[in-house]
From Swiss-Prot:
Catalytic activity: L-glutaminyl-[peptide chain release factor] + S-adenosyl-L-methionine = N(5)-methyl-L-glutaminyl-[peptide chain release factor] + S-adenosyl-L-homocysteine + H(+)
Protein's name in the database: Release factor glutamine methyltransferase
SUPFAM superfamilies xrefs: S-adenosyl-L-methionine-dependent methyltransferases
S-adenosyl-L-methionine keyword on record: yes
Mitochondrion listed as a keyword: no
Keywords from the named record: Methyltransferase, S-adenosyl-L-methionine, Transferase
Originating species: Shigella dysenteriae serotype 1 (strain Sd197)
Gene, per the UniProt record: prmC
Family: Belongs to the protein N5-glutamine methyltransferase family. PrmC subfamily.
Described function: Methylates the class 1 translation termination release factors RF1/PrfA and RF2/PrfB on the glutamine residue of the universally conserved GGQ motif.
GO biological process: methylation
Binding annotation for S-adenosyl-L-methionine: 117-121, 140, 168, 183
Transmembrane segments: none
Length: 277
């Protein structure tokens, strides 16, 4: 079967996807090892029998809703190719807004930054790549996530990062940081969106929080006060309908200069504040 023939067949079978053509192209690139430009320019190239079998298996899994990132094992974030697995969240483009806001507020001089619930290490590695003069600490309570983040750091040859297992601040006693960032669980366990799309294949522990999705957010806001240098920043990603509640939690905890930033879809996505000791 030719590349172009397989693409047509795959696109027709993936109409339930938000991006059937791109999904099909990614799977073909993954199995053949060829780039998109080559595949489109040489569409008459023949697939081997082994490649056809691999593609059929992947196409079935994608048709059943399994995320493309899980099928290929890789997702790009901040132009960094990251290994992903079912043990962690798949990095989303909107989380790059958190990285942008963090970089805009970091002091010019070297400092220490903490990423809570690092997962793949996406946020921490993006900050470490952009600010090689800073020392990044990234923690996750799940050992599989810690191992994956360490693998990504090694693969990207990023040295200014320390990744360890910790239940939020449990292993960080006495340490202080100029900035703390986190994309914590913030979805209500009753949210119907948990039964839709990629999140069906992602760990609930990384998605769901008690108290209508606010429990971990409030915990981080309160506990970060002891881990920030005076005037340090806390930046949190949250759900698009949680902006007001998160701002109030910051204010009640004594933070200053509290504001919410919008994502690429113009939804409230990142709330931040400064804490003075």
């Amino acid at each position: 079967m030719e590349y172009q023939h397989w693409l047509r067949e795959a696109i027709s079978q993936l109409q339930a996807s938000e991006s059937p053509r791109r999904d099909a192209e990614i799977l073909l690139e993954h199995v053949t090892g060829k780039g998109r430009t080559f595949i489109l320019a040489f569409g008459e190239t023949q697939l081997t029998d082994e490649q056809c079998q691999q593609l059929d298996a992947l196409l079935t899994r994608r048709r059943d809703g399994e995320p493309i990132a899980h099928l290929t094992g890789v997702r790009e974030f901040w132009s960094l190719p990251l290994f992903v697995s079912p043990a962690t969240l798949i990095p989303r483009p909107d989380t790059e807004c958190l990285v942008e806001q963090a970089l805009a507020r970091l002091p010019e001089q070297p400092c220490r930054i903490l990423d809570l619930g690092t997962g793949t290490g996406a946020i921490a590695l993006a900050l470490a790549r952009e600010r090689p003069d800073c020392e990044i600490t990234a923690v996750d309570r799940m050992p599989d996530a810690v191992a994956l983040a360490q693998r990504n750091a090694q693969h990207l040859a990023i040295k200014n990062i320390h990744i360890l297992q910790s239940d939020w601040f449990s292993e960080l006693a006495g340490q202080q940081f100029a900035m703390i960032v986190s994309n914590p669980p913030y979805i209500d366990e009753q949210d119907p969106h948990l039964q839709q799309g990629d999140v069906r294949f992602e760990p609930l522990t990384a998605l769901v929080a008690a108290d209508s999705g606010m429990a971990d957010i409030v915990h981080i806001i309160e506990q970060s006060r002891n881990a920030l240098v005076s005037g340090g920043f806390l930046l949190l990603e949250h759900g698009w309908q949680q902006g007001e509640a998160v701002r109030q939690a910051f204010i009640l905890a004594g933070y200053h200069d509290v504001e919410t930033c919008r994502d690429y879809g113009d939804n409230e996505r990142v709330t931040l504040g400064r804490y003075y000791q």
